[in-house]
Amino acid sequence: MIRTAAALALALVALPASAEEAPYRPDCGRIDAFLGKLVADGRTVGASALVWKDGAEACFEAVGDADREAARPIARDTLFQIYSMTKPVTGVALMQLWEQGKFGLDDPLEWHLPEYAALKVADGENPDGSPILREPKRKVTIRDVLRHTAGFTYGADGEPQNAADRAWSRLQPLAFDKTLAEFSQAMAQVPLLYDPGAHWHYSAGVDVQARLVEVLSGQPFAEYVAQHIFQPLGMKDSGWKRTPADRARLASAYYAEAGALVPVPEALLLEPNFKGKPMTMGGAGIVTTVDDYMTFARMLLGQGTLNGTRILKPSTLRLMTTDQLDPRIPTENRQWLPGKGSGGFGIDLFVRTAPPQSPQENRGSVGEFFWDGFPSMLFWVDPAQDMAVVFATQKIPFDNAMHREFREAVYGADYQGPAGD
């Protein structure tokens, strides 16, 4: 028995490298087949995917239409509304100013935006519908604003059910006709849903970040981002304000309704982009291409630097991609965040802290970070695999199942992380 075991051990050591577990490589054919099935099954009108691995492009696949009614196919230069994938761009902009010493992460928000000095927590409602308000247990800090623990709301998805969402509905802080300064004044009048630090709750806090960029830099938000992120990185197709010529490349958005995909009227989504409205949200609004956003993702993969251009210090990028949530915040107080996978939240980014815990969980590597956008957009950066991925489509409402299946197409259904982890 001992001789047999020793012989087996020797045989294993002598195995050629090809017999060992092969390094992970994305299967471009599998990704293309997945996109084709999405379109063939009527789950979206068109989609594209770009994968960058080990310092080079690994895959670009595009299937279906950018505009079904015009019979215009998805192309490499198609423009997409990325919605909440705007948020990491805003976070990078604000953290550049943090590097310059313009603020501290634990500064009370009111030090830099005085309109928030009188924030109250909504603690129910009186019989006449008026809010019951109380003082928060502590001040909202900029760190809270960066990690969605301020207690802010994003408004109700449907009929308002509490005093904070009713105030949002009445004040409409993010109305397209408002500037970011006007947004912030209105937002400061909306009561907090929770005490600062008590809950993770997705909110308009990233739009507050955009206003902070304006106040701390002395520049309009979109101008700052263009000068300090887009232009240095060569992201020529990215921005909020668009020209009429851009319509020829713009992907239309479609709403899934009663088994059909219905075009979304432009007025519901694109007025700030094409009609000169003043709002430039920090949490949404950028229109870009998969290549431009991949440039941004590659900068993140490069620890803040791309092609010799430094946007952030490596230490700042590590801070952004480290879980910032207090472990004492229970799962039930993290809204829908646990559905993104085994992890937490950094600065405007989900951060994976453990391998997938079940077959139903999104595939990914420990240390990856990502975010997504309302029309089922998605990007992620996987440092362990030296990989960045951008998935682009314009299917509303947000389709989490589509993302889970796309990740399986990229990684394989059984992926748990790099070999040896």
Model-identified regions with their sequence ranges:
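Short, surface-exposed loop or secondary-structure junction motifs
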Residues: 114, 118-363
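Short, conserved catalytic-motif segment at the N-terminal edge
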Residues: 22-82, 102-104, 118-125, 400, ...
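N-terminal signal peptide c-region/cleavage motif recognized by signal peptidases
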Residues: 14-18
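Short, surface-exposed beta-strand/loop micro-motifs that present aromatic residues
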Residues: 368, 375-385
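A generic structural motif
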Residues: 64-66, 268, 395
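Active-site SXXK
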Residues: 29-38, 49, 55-57, 80-109, ...
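Bacterial N-terminal signal peptides that target proteins for export
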Residues: 1-6
